[in-house]
Structures are given as C-alpha cells and as structure tokens.
Amino acid sequence: MKKSTLINSEVSRLIATLGHTDEITICDAGLPIPDHVQRIDLALAHGIPGFLDTVRVILSESQIEGVIIAEEFATVSPVHHDALITELAQESGLTGKPIAINYVSHEDFKVRTSQSRAVVRTGECTPYANVILQAGVVF
C-alpha cells in the first residue's frame, strides 16, 4: 500500500505524469466538465470530499507554480477563497517557490478548463469553489 498522503490511484497517476505548466482543475460539484477532458469524480455526497481538503492533498504531492481562480470566488464565497489563498501561501512557504495567482471571469475559467489534463470533481457545494493548478518543477 502506498505510504504517502494521496492514495487515490487516478489522481496519483495524474500527478506523476504532469509536465511543467500542465494544468489540473479541482472543482465543486456543479462545474461543467468538457467531454474531452479526463474526469476524476471524487464526489460522494454534498460536501464530501470538500474542495479545500482535496486541494491540500493534491498540493502535498505536486509542485505548483501558478493558479487560476474565478474573480467571483472572492466576492461570493470569501471564506473559502481566503482559505485557499492561505493554503497557497503556506505551500509557497514550504517549497520556497512563489505561486502566481491569476484571476479571470467565471466564464473564462470554464473555457480554460478545456486545457486541463484532468478535472477533479469534489462534493463541494460552495459557489465558485474551483481552481486550476499549473504544474511547476521541483528543481
């Protein structure tokens, strides 16, 4: 059995095969997922697993150099938005590498998901609780 935090085989395989600047979307239960993009559906029930828990686990296994967030997230769901920003700051502190934060409209965010290697769907039911992670390098 795998010893590290992440034990989901699909997500683990995805992270292991990421190249520099590849993107992964982590989304709430309602975000539309393009047909041609791999869907990794973790949603079990409303709120399970949560968005932030999923972000934490994926951050623990991958090097991220940037994120894309919908502008609406900060205004409509500020508690979750601020918690995400805190997680990103902590990750940056642990790795010693900056994480660029870019905001786009929700409509542009949905279009951008089509570039993701995969979309990881959570059970989160908080509006706009979505993030696109951009892979960095560990060296």
Swiss-Prot record:
Catalytic activity: beta-D-ribopyranose = beta-D-ribofuranose
EC number: 5.4.99.62
Active-site residues, as the UniProt record annotates them: H20
GO cellular component, one term: cytosol
Pfam family, one: RbsD_FucU
Cell compartment(s), UniProt: Cytoplasm
Residues in coiled coil: none
Pathway where it operates: Carbohydrate metabolism; D-ribose degradation; D-ribose 5-phosphate from beta-D-ribopyranose: step 1/2
Keyword field: Carbohydrate metabolism, Cytoplasm, Isomerase
Domain of life assignment: Bacteria
GO molecular function: D-ribose pyranase activity; intramolecular lyase activity; monosaccharide binding
Function description: Catalyzes the interconversion of beta-pyran and beta-furan forms of D-ribose.
Self-association state and partner proteins as the record states: Homodecamer.
Name of the protein: D-ribose pyranase
Source lineage: Bacteria, Pseudomonadati, Pseudomonadota, Gammaproteobacteria, Vibrionales
